[in-house]
């Protein structure tokens, strides 16, 4: 899901996030000193960071909501960014 959002958005920021995430995941796979549990933990943290970063981009946030099957907030539908809490 976190890979779909930056690919759908396609802005420079989301493309950089996607590139960095894929590079980090590739490096993680090649690390032979880490246990499988440590690799899984690191991968989860990378994904959480990617989701956080994508949510700070309007297009990325909307793509992430679509990927999750969630409706956009009223403020986002009106093009005003995220609704205030």
UniProtKB/Swiss-Prot annotation:
Coiled-coil annotated residue ranges, if any: none
Keyword Membrane: no
One GO BP: symbiont-mediated suppression of host NF-kappaB cascade
Keywords: Host cytoplasm, Host-virus interaction, Inhibition of host NF-kappa-B by virus
Disulfide bond residue pairs: none
GO cellular component term, pick one: host cell cytoplasm
Record's subcellular location: Host cytoplasm
UniProt function note: Plays a role in the inhibition of the host NF-kappa-B pathway by preventing ubiquitin binding-dependent regulation of host IKBKB activation by IKBKG/NEMO.
Quaternary assembly: Interacts with host IKBKG; this interaction prevents NF-kappa-B activation.
Name this protein carries in UniProt: Protein MC005
Provenance organism: Molluscum contagiosum virus subtype 1 (MOCV)
Gene: MC005L
